[in-house]
Amino acid sequence: MAVTTIEAGVIVEQIRMLPSGEIALELRSGATVRLDWEVWSALDLPTAVALDAEQAKALAVAEGRFRVRSKALELLANREHSSWELRQKLRQRFQDPKAIDECLVLLEERGYLSDERFAQRFLESRIANRDHGPYRLLAELQQRGISRELAESLLHEYDSPHLWLEKAERAKERILRRSKTVNPQSLWSKLHQQGFSGATISAALRDLPQPEL
């Protein structure tokens, strides 16, 4: 969405309702500004006359907020995001921290943005497709801005020794296939890096000599 310069003297020539429910303001300069109808109504700005500095500033702020929210919804349409992730991406594109914060609050209130839902989907995907242990998953969630309390609560739903042992054994077999010679100490270290507990690693390596820790 191209950035439109809105300054004192700008004139709104025409207002068009869009199929999305938004409106397009056609400016005399040839530029187009998009807003939500309720926002435009609240601004109560005149048409066909030049806006003064205060009016132009109000329109510019509203247009900036609309652009932030539009980009946020576009990103969320591609995949779930944590609040932290979405804030970081918006900060790369926009220089208005207040507009970004207001946008995130609005999206959370309307249910478009949810750290809990993001974390649930993240865990579902990781557990279905990767052989990582719970400590690795906990760290990855925290790296994405999820609180430790929420991450641990959701991971507790997968608190199954059988699940983690199965994943550790698959990870072990993959490591052994890739390396011609792997000693027990190295194998233990690699599985530890994948986020498995000592007890799970010991069970997965039960047929091998145990390393001295």
Where are these regions (language model features)?
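An alpha-helical, amphipathic repeat domain used for nucleic-acid recognition
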Residues: 1-213
